[in-house]
């Protein structure tokens, strides 16, 4: 299972099911947008912004229990900091493939949470 339920369960306790559902939907939308943006930043060799966006994605995905995505984002961040375009491209391809699957799994988890 790619989704660690512990941070999700804690957020539901903290903000309630309805608010969490809204936050999670926004997170899914934003994550998909960031993944696309990372590709553009890599193509533009905008290392600083690529690293910044990967860093933000790392923390956001970790907050929603998507630790595999967070780990890949950390690798992209490191590659960007070192200006290693080939390594960033490899990790971005992994991120793109994994994001679709993990976000679909998160969507399934959301269906189990009472709003």
What label would you give each PLM region?
Residues 1-52, 56-115:
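Two-component system phosphorelay core
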